[in-house]
Amino acid sequence: MTPFLNETHDLFLKSWVESANAPDCDFPIQNLPFGVFQRRESEEPARIGIAIGDRILDLTCCIKLRLFDHLPESLKNACTATRLNSLMALGSESASLLRSTVSQLLRIDSGQSPPEANILVAMTDAELLLPAEIGDYTDFYASIFHATNVGKLFRPDNPLLPNYKYVPIAYHGRASSIVPGGIPICRPQGQRKPPDAAVPEFALSRMLDYELEVGCFVGAGNSIGQPISIDRAEDHIFGLCLVNDWSARDLQAWEYQPLGPFLAKNFATTLSPWIVTLEALAPFRDAAFQRSNDDPQPLPYLFSKSNQESGGFAITLEVWLRTEQMRAEGMAAVRLSQGSFSQMYWTIAQM
């Protein structure tokens, strides 16, 4: 699938939601990420929303006010669900139609004066929830730099295993411990074996670590035994989010052989509550990672000319630290790391 720009990406678009037009706004009208929220101190069920400025567009309210009457019934029904699963399952064409509709509704030149108080909820008045019911998830080892650095911790003489450059390496994670951002994480406990100890001990982890990752929500699925070709893979992708893959390195070092990590990884995974659609990311598409001349080329089923040309994403990712004590003392956050998602060895379509 080749990403295309359309009118929703126009840099000159402005919204009648004033906060969305601020230069440093995370949610301008060109973004329009999807999420699920619940009004604070309300017994109403969760609702699907779209972030715009410092507000959330309530899709259920839009349906009730007949602002989306031209949309297909299946899409309107999906907009009133309490999770994004039904909407994502409709596929990329439906997601694109909804994005276009919302973009037109929120434009300052739309010619409409919708009842703002009824369709918008202040971010401060909402609790952000997990955007979808996640029955399963796969954790890929897509950065060759990360794989090499972590490999050095456990295999200094052989950090990168020979299969890495041939097949996207992954393992299944624990879906039941996925939480949205803002939920406190408990320090895990398990077996750890200090280098100078003869036997392991059971204790709290002393090497709790973070991993900055990008999550990918799969929408429309496929039948068992029917593979999805690399050229059609992105038709099944709804959008991306941020992920913190919490890791207990001391537990991991002891337990990971021979089948890989388990308790060191399954205690918590944090997701950002907003999903940015692939269509919204079209202006940031990039070529796939350029392998060195010594590296093998992908096997035919993992190779596509269009994927090589635009399978990457030119997204800069950062990790900032601001502890409770730093906040109490009015200290500024400290940046721990910065990297580019375009440096992933494997593209999303290949994975």
Go through the PLM ranges and name each one.
Residues 1-7:
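Charged, compositionally biased non-catalytic regions
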Residues 340-351:
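Extended C-terminal subregions enriched in glycine
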Residues 8-42, 51, 57-334:
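Active-site microenvironments in enzyme catalytic cores
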Residues 48:
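Short, surface-exposed charged micro-motifs
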